[in-house]
Amino acid sequence: MGKTRIKKGDLVQVITRVRGRRNADGTKTSDLGKQGKVLEVIAETDRVLVEGVNRIKRHTKARPGVEGGIVEREAPIHISNVQLVDPETKKPTRVGIRTEQVERDGRTKTNRIRVAKRSGKDI
């Protein structure tokens, strides 16, 4: 469980296959290369929810006030299986940190800025 450099709202790309995924007809499927926006970061388990990636079907039982049926939603994917998409090149990139000293009201504050390693641009 480390400090993650991927945040909610970032555009990421899946860089590995997720094991055990199958289509309805039993053939293997993969989200490799798909891009999507991060919906949620689960820091405790180092996982992220990515829009349109790793979709699963849940069979829910009807309860009072809630209709039952098959619900399709995103399942978490490990953070090591995704990479941030560089805003300039639109390709996956690693993320670096650049520190910047800002002086305001006589006090010095350090800002940490995320930087795309591929292009060197701020994220």
Curated annotation (Swiss-Prot):
Q: Which UniProt keywords apply?
A: Ribonucleoprotein, Ribosomal protein, RNA-binding, rRNA-binding
- Which Gene Ontology BP annotations are present? translation
Q: Which GO terms describe its molecular function?
A: rRNA binding; structural constituent of ribosome
What is the species listed in this Swiss-Prot or TrEMBL entry?
A: Kineococcus radiotolerans (strain ATCC BAA-149 / DSM 14245 / SRS30216)
- Provide the family line: Belongs to the universal ribosomal protein uL24 family.
Which function does this protein serve?
Answer: One of two assembly initiator proteins, it binds directly to the 5'-end of the 23S rRNA, where it nucleates assembly of the 50S subunit. One of the proteins that surrounds the polypeptide exit tunnel on the outside of the subunit.
**High-level lineage:** Bacteria, Bacillati, Actinomycetota, Actinomycetes, Kineosporiales
One of this protein's Pfam families, by short name?
A: ribosomal_L24
Listed under subunit, the entry gives:
Part of the 50S ribosomal subunit.
Listed HAMAP family: Ribosomal_uL24_B
The answer, when asked if Ligase is one of the entry's keywords, is no
- What is the name attached to this protein's record? Large ribosomal subunit protein uL24
Q: Which GO terms describe its cellular component?
A: ribonucleoprotein complex; ribosome
What Gene3D superfamilies does the annotation carry? 2.30.30.30
**Gene name tied to this protein:** rplX
